[in-house]
């Protein structure tokens, strides 16, 4: 019985007969007559492993290896007499060996490699998720959380006054202490929340939704002016903008889990946000840093290895320009619609005055009713102007700011790449310095040079990982942003078309009701 392989004779190294074969086939197989002086270090050692495995394998395992032989018939049970038995083990013995005592693992490995194509067996170690799968994962992100901002309230007098908003949250998520709660927040609190989130997440490639822009003129009117229609209109615009901003924050899976967001929604009192004023020291420092980043961005020329990022960045820049042009046109439309409403109101007053001075009763009544129709139409124009603003102009304004944040994510990826390249250049200089020390035979400084090389090798590896991670995050964030943008535009455009349809239907209804009065004029 062959248990090792070092003391086996030539006859023992021959493959054993399969069950069901006649003795003649065994004799035919033994006709090779190898020399007795063969050593175990020669090429025939490959049959040693095969012979031992075959003696200790069950017929089921041996049969599973036979389909490799292209000349076998009936699953390898009936062999042709003139075929050499070595062909049966030509492929199987390549994967089997007795170097390890864990023969069961070798058998499983052999069966796996035989059943899979070579390329598939190599690539089956760690499957990488595709970005289509990442997009499907984003579709599963559904959060049962709704925030609302209501009741803007002016607190204080003069230039020290501020406006507080009621932030109401409804949710069934276990992250929060209750299902419904409300807190009071001022505008600087919203700005402070953005600063905290941006500081933590923007450097990692996340798209942090921006808050609405400051309006120094609008807030000055609210602080020192009386409560008129312009102040109420400004507060309503800001309230709606803050609500959209906060809803985008809680819709983001990463932002929702941030403790600063939960604190903003739940905590009764927040510490005063500092550095949010435009003319403060922190505000001026931010403006200076933005200018510095813009200059450094112009000096960085990135060798893009992934064409996807280059194409997406061009799409984002072109889309931002188009949205700016469209936003300017929509703002003009809003102003014209408001002007039309004012002119319609003046027209209605003039018709009413003319109707009251008319002697013809039928004509006087018709003019008076026409004035009433024009007053109703003036209300329609005013409502439609508001719809133009809140459903179109504000949507475009939000996405102009969001696209700027998307560009910032690409810029952050570029900075990470530049840091990686700078580290590689520094590592190359350290290696050159080590080579000069070796050439100059200065062993006292050589160890320090080696330590610096090890340190920079570690930095290069870490920076490369950072670049790969931020590339993955930016790609995933852009895919999510495009989905949210499509859904957002669809909802707003549908609502806008519904308002236009309602306005036209009401307009036709008013004129149809007035037509009999016009025909009744004698």
UniProtKB/Swiss-Prot annotation:
State the UniProt keywords alphabetically. Acetylation, Cell projection, Endosome, Golgi apparatus, Lipid-binding, Membrane, Phosphoprotein, Protein transport, Transport
Compositionally biased tracts (Acidic residues):
35-45, 132-142
Which Pfam family is one of this chain's hits? Answer: Sorting_nexin
Its source organism is: Homo sapiens (Human)
Which residues are recorded as binding a 1,2-diacyl-sn-glycero-3-phospho-(1D-myo-inositol-3-phosphate)? 186, 188, 214, 238
Q: Which residues carry this modification: Phosphothreonine?
A: 41, 48
Name of the protein in its database record: Sorting nexin-1
The record's note on its domains = The BAR domain is able to sense membrane curvature upon dimerization. Membrane remodeling seems to implicate insertion of a N-terminal amphipathic helix (AH) in the membrane.
Superkingdom field: Eukaryota
The effect annotated for residue 445 to A is:
No effect on membrane remodeling and membrane binding
Region (Disordered), start-end ranges: 1-84, 115-142
Task: From the UniProt record, report the name of the gene that encodes this protein.
Answer: SNX1
Tell me what happens on changing residue 214 to A: Abolishes phosphatidylinositol phosphate binding. Abolishes endosomal location
């Amino acid at each position: 019985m062959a248990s090792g392989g070092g003391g086996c004779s030539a006859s023992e190294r021959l493959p054993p007969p399969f069950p069901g074969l006649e003795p003649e086939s065994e004799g035919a197989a033994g006709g090779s007559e190898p020399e007795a002086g063969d050593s175990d270090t020669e090429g025939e050692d490959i049959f040693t492993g095969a012979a031992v495995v075959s003696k200790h394998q069950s017929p089921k395992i041996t049969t599973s290896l036979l389909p490799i032989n292209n000349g076998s018939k009936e699953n390898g049970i009936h062999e042709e007499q003139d075929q050499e038995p070595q062909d049966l083990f030509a492929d199987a013995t390549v994967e089997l060996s007795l170097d390890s005592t864990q023969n069961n693992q070798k058998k499983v490995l052999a069966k796996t490699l035989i059943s899979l194509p070579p390329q598939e067996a190599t690539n089956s170690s760690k499957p990488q998720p595709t970005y289509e799968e990442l997009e499907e994962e984003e579709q599963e992100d559904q959060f049962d959380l709704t925030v609302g901002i209501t009741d803007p309230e002016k607190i204080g007098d003069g230039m020290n006054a501020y406006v507080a908003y009621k932030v109401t949250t409804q949710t069934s998520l276990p992250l929060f202490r209750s299902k419904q709660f409300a807190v009071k927040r001022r505008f600087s609190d919203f700005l402070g929340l953005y600063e905290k989130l941006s500081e933590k997440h923007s450097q990692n490639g996340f798209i942090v939704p921006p808050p609405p822009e400051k309006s120094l003129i609008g807030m000055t009117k609210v602080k020192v002016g009386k409560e008129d229609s312009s102040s109420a209109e400004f507060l309503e615009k800001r309230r709606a903008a803050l609500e959209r901003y906060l809803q985008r924050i809680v819709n983001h899976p990463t932002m929702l889990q941030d403790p600063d967001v939960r604190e903003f929604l739940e905590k009764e009192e927040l510490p005063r946000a500092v550095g949010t004023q435009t003319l403060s020291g922190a505000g001026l420092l931010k403006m200076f840093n933005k200018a510095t980043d813009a200059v450094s961005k112009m000096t960085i020329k990135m060798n893009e290895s992934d064409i996807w990022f280059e194409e997406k960045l061009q799409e984002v820049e072109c889309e931002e320009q188009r949205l700016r042009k469209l936003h300017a046109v929509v703002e003009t439309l809003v102003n014209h619609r408001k002007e039309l409403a004012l002119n319609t109101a003046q027209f209605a007053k003039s018709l009413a005055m003319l109707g009251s001075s008319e002697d013809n009763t039928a004509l006087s009544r018709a003019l008076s009713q026409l004035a009433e129709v024009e007053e109703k139409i003036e209300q329609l124009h005013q409502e439609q102007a508001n719809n133009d603003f809140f459903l179109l102009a504000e949507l475009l304004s939000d996405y102009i700011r969001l696209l700027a944040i998307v560009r910032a994510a690409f810029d952050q990826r570029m900075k990470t790449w530049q840091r990686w390249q700078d580290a590689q250049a520094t590592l190359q200089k350290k290696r050159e310095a080590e080579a000069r020390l070796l050439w100059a035979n200065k062993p006292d400084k050589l160890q320090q040079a080696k330590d610096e090389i090890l340190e920079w090798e570690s930095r290069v590896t870490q920076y490369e990982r950072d670049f790969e991670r931020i590339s993955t995050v930016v790609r995933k964030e852009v895919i999510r942003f495009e989905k949210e943008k499509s859904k957002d535009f669809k909802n707003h455009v549908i609502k806008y078309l519904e308002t236009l349809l309602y306005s036209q239907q009401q307009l036709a209804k008013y004129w149809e009701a007035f037509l009999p009065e016009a025909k009744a004029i004698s």
